[in-house]
């Protein structure tokens, strides 16, 4: 906390110190009868503090944008058909909770991450001790794992992996994994801990490290400084970026810090200089706020097996057209960008979601909601994939993909139906089968179930 709270924030303390000293001088002048001078001093202090905050905060973004340059791409790589994230984060978490029964342990959505599972995309959440006694004396008791692999039956997607960790999350004082990390390297920042599969039922904790490079006169620029690995025995290995990338256990897997990927893209509003982020100009970007709790970047696997963090941006202002799609290699941090002409009106994620909400028969925001605006490049066309779920996020009502060029919507009522479309196979359900028809069928089933219950009562 000394490093992060004092050293990294030393330049942000400067405006506060300036304000304190300046207003002390103004107060002294006011008491001495120099009221006009006190007013002038006070106004000067306000301007100085505002200017210092501006230089410090915006300057960090500006220097970050100058450090990280994106390679322009002419085309967008197609998605891997076996690596599409079909199940949203919230639905996967609720499925884990439903199948997890324990009074002494718990799983937290804040500790759950999307990672590679059995060669496909999935989710892993650590099983951590619960309660005052448990957090001091019990160990992190393995993981809940959700596999989003195609072809699996819903009952086989969630499993419990028993792998106690000697140093883990939710374990206080000496066994706390955060303590182990900062004892190994106190002069860095660990934005996240997630767990990668290195065997059939074996995982290791992965903690990417971020350090800050000083740039004159008062800027700190973040960079990926390596990765710390903690195994179940509590052994801590600190790897450089090159060592982590070359480690055969993590071949092609997520290593680059997700939060740093977002920071780098956010800084691109200053890509044309310090003042370029403060006025409306061609090329100024914004990252839209998406429906549901999960925001970009999303982890996306290409047809050649690369995992990418993808962040879609729109022109700053009131435009909702897709402008740039930033891609950061989740394994080695390579940067690329796909730029479109906003005048062509390619649908961005928020406006495409409004198209899905135009489907009648659902009370959006009360009974049903959209989850995860997921980018889905397929056969040379970019789609946005949405999951429509009940408001609690406990199940999937249907899945929709929106064509970004013409706004057409495809509806899928099952994972098999979606996989058939993705693979170019003939879909088993008729094209005219709509969400409204599905809702009517659900209502009829509910009426029939109610009638059967009444018959059973009468028979009894």
Please give the residue ranges for each predicted region:
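Soluble extracytoplasmic regions of secretory-pathway and membrane proteins
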Residues: 1-460
């Amino acid at each position: 906390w000394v490093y992060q709270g004092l050293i990294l924030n030393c330049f942000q303390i400067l405006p506060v110190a300036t304000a304190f000293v300046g207003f002390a001088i103004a107060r002294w002048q006011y008491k001495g009868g120099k009221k006009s001078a006190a007013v002038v001093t006070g106004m000067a202090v306000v301007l100085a503090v505002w200017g210092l905050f501006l230089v410090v905060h915006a300057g960090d973004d500006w220097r970050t944008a100058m450090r990280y340059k994106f390679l322009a791409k002419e085309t967008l790589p197609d998605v891997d058909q076996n690596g599409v994230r079909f199940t949203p984060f919230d639905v996967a978490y609720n499925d884990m909770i439903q199948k997890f029964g324990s009074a002494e342990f718990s799983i937290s959505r804040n500790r759950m991450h999307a990672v590679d599972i059995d060669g496909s995309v999935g989710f892993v959440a650590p099983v951590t001790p619960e309660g005052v006694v448990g957090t001091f004396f019990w160990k992190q008791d393995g993981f809940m794992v959700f596999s989003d692999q195609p072809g699996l039956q819903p009952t086989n997607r969630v499993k419990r992996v028993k792998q106690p960790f000697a140093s883990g999350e939710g374990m206080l004082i000496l066994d706390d994994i955060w303590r182990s990390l900062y004892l190994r390297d106190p002069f860095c920042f660990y934005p996240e801990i997630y767990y990668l599969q290195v065997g059939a039922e074996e995982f290791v904790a992965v903690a990417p490290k971020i350090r800050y490079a000083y740039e004159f006169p008062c800027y700190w620029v973040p960079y990926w400084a390596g990765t710390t690995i903690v195994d179940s025995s509590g052994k801590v290995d600190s790897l450089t970026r090159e060592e982590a990338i070359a480690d055969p256990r993590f071949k092609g897997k997520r290593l680059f810090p997700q939060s740093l990927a977002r920071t780098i893209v956010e800084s691109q509003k200053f890509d044309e200089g310090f003042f370029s982020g403060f006025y409306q100009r061609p090329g100024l970007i914004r990252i839209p706020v998406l429906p549901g709790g999960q925001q970009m970047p999303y982890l996306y696997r290409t047809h050649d097996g690369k995992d990418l963090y993808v962040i879609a941006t729109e022109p700053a202002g009131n435009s909702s057209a897709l402008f740039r799609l930033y891609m950061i290699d989740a394994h080695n941090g390579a940067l690329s960008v796909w730029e479109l002409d906003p005048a062509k009106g390619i649908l961005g994620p928020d406006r495409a979601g409004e198209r899905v909400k135009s489907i009648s028969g659902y009370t959006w925001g009360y009974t049903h909601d959209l989850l995860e605006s997921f980018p889905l490049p397929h056969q040379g066309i970019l789609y946005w994939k949405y999951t429509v779920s009940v408001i609690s996020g406990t199940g999937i009502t249907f899945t929709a993909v929106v064509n970004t060029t013409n706004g057409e919507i495809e509806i899928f009522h099952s994972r098999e139906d979606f996989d058939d479309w993705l693979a170019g196979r003939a879909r088993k359900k008729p094209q005219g089968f709509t969400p409204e028809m599905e809702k009517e069928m659900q209502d009829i089933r509910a009426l029939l179930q109610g009638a059967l219950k009444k018959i059973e009562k009468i028979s009894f």
